[in-house]
Amino acid sequence: VECGCLMRDLDRALAVHGRQLRLFPSTWRSATIGGFISGGSGGIGSVRWGFLRDPGHLLGLEVVTMEASPRLLQLEAAEAEALNHAYGTNGIITALTLSTAARVAWQEVVVDCPDWTTAVGLAQRCGQAAVELNLCTVLQSAIVDRLPSWSGPARGQHRLLLLVAPDGVSTIERLASSVKAEVQVLGQEENHQGNGLRELSWNHTTLHLRNHDPNWTYLQMLLPQPELVCMEALQQRWGADLVWHLEAVRQQGAFRLAALPVVYWRGAKALQDLIDDCRAQGAFVFNPHVLTVEGGGLGVIDGDQVAAKHRHDPDGLLNPGKLGGFSA
């Protein structure tokens, strides 16, 4: 597929063949597939399929080099990995080949829980059950209270948002009933109006809060296990300035809870203090408030990305300064 194709249009084209993309950002209506590969990492589908850089998702790239005499390259999966999540720093992607999945008639299920411990525990049980999920989002009530009206009444409770295969709905209902949580089965996911559960998840959660108050921002992190210990310690210190939003993911094949907490902006120092606090509690923070690829990722230089930039963009003209390990 050409990299400028909107993911919305690509999904429609795949539907004709009974297929679907494995991973979507919450911005899938306006995002291009090339932009997602270059700057995305995961999203809807990560509870099944992990992250974009996991082997098996990106099968190949067509790339134009930024040289005095540009070359058109066809990169197989192994070579293409260096350009995956590199923010366009080491080659101009013109087309790509991705793995897809069999299409599933995902069912939207909302579960409300009276306390946070129950909500987190239920998410873990759902994610570890023998059911197919495409989304498992967990939101504290302070977020639910600020979601758009079409998302349903807030009820003052913490909420799970689930996309479940049809044969798994009864299992989710049974698990929820066992902890006295309230279940609403909304039916098959319809993505025509922009008001489905996926539009409440991942980065759209932050976008909805920013519609209320632009001082809300966010962080990204992988929580240490057991997750509640870390979350409770941070909540005690930061209070209402930190509101938890969790997404179930597969990390190297294992079920984990990633966190995209919304954070009230109190200045750069306060944000850095919070990041330091999270790290002290054992969380691995992927800081979205920094310039470089390395700073927002694992914090180390990726030698393969740098080597690809030297091959494809020796003068450093593509997205200059973004790849911290490169010097022309």
Residue ranges and their predicted role:
Residues 7-8, 12-132, 136:
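FAD-binding subdomain of flavoenzyme oxidoreductases
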Residues 28, 181-328:
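Conserved glycine-rich FAD pyrophosphate-binding loop
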Residues 94-103, 142-156, 204-212, 246-253:
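Short, flexible, solvent-exposed loop/turn segments with mixed acidic/basic and small polar residues
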Residues 74-83, 90, 132-147, 186-193, ...:
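Conserved alpha/beta core surface patches that mediate binding of polyanionic ligands
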Residues 4:
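Extended, alpha-helix-rich binding/interface surfaces that flank or overlap catalytic cores
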Residues 1, 107-112, 152-174, 217-222, ...:
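Short cationic amphipathic helices and targeting signals
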Residues 9, 116-122, 168-175, 226-233, ...:
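Short, conserved charged micro-motifs
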Residues 113, 127-186:
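A conserved active-site cap/scaffold subdomain adjacent to cofactor or substrate pockets
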